Amino acid sequence: GPVMTRALTHLDNCYFIKSLKAIGYVCKTNTVSNTAFRGFGGPQGMLTIENILYSVSQYLQKPIDEIRKINYYSKLNGLKTPYGQIVKNLRIDRILDEVYKLSDYKNRLRNINKFNLNQKANNLPFRKGIALMPAKFGISFNKPSLNQGGALVHVYSDGSIRLNHGGTEMGQGLFIKVAQVVAECFKVPLEQIHITSTNTAEVPNTSATAASSGSDLNGMAAWNASNVIKNRMIDHAAKLFKKNKKDIVLGEGRIICGNRSLSFSELAFSCWENRISLSSTGYYKTPKISWDQGKLRGHPYFYFTWGAAISEALLDINTGESRILRADIVQDCGNSLNENIDIGQIEGGFIQGLGWLTCEELCFSKEGKL
């Protein structure tokens, strides 16, 4: 299944592994049916290799960060994943440099070691720990047919713009991001974009909004639709100004040609008067991806996102109670469409992962009852 496939393709995490064979088994159980939420198998795969590296560090009696360092993807070690994809956008070195600097890791590690020695010497129950967790996450569905998106854009004669696309808004900020893409294409204020709820009567055959692909698929589809309309409007503006369309510039809600200009709404009205279509569908499919599910080989991800977190925890060894004292996170978001939304997603992802690993557990009886 797709969850197991993502787990298997994330067993390498950030590390070059020359020889790896992994087989996943999906089993039916007597418990209530459930599925993955965030990460969709990725975190489980990453934790597997991290536990392996931890075992190696314990056996060799070396810090785990040293074991990690000599195994990261690099031009020296190798850039080919166990499933055959070449890692091109390598960001791990820069991210590690930034997260170590941001977290003041070395000084804090020394202070934590002193704290633990003092607690142990005085027979006190508290212990502190600090740890790094790097991550490489593949962006795309590992079923190629799902990597497609559609959009419908209308420009009205008063200059207002209506947008519909195949993505689902569930509080993650997708609608705002796609609206920003349209606003950027037309060079108009965001307030001019009116978003309507996702509806297969308007945009059919939608893919799931998942796999961190919603902004990519629907944003590009909306851009393509908007670009068709924009080019029609520019062609008309060139006729109005009696200039080459290369001389037409869009900016801040206006269409400019030398020392002459029109507002976007004025041009939209003129297009309508001259019977120029101001509506278009848009479609996008992720390029350069392929996957053989039977062989678990191919190029399933368009690109990878990289990140790292350094967390400090306090533990009561008598009660088992723990608390996160501080977390520093560095995440590669490329050219972020909306930094505030992305920061919220990063923080939310960390908190959800914290809950998953520390306090969330479904307990079942032998009969399978919750």
Residue spans for each PLM region:
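Acidic-enriched catalytic cores of C-N bond-cleaving enzymes acting on peptides and small amides
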Residues: 58, 62
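Short, solvent-exposed positions on alpha-helices
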Residues: 65-66
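Accessory "access/gating" subregions that flank catalytic or transport cores
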Residues: 69-154
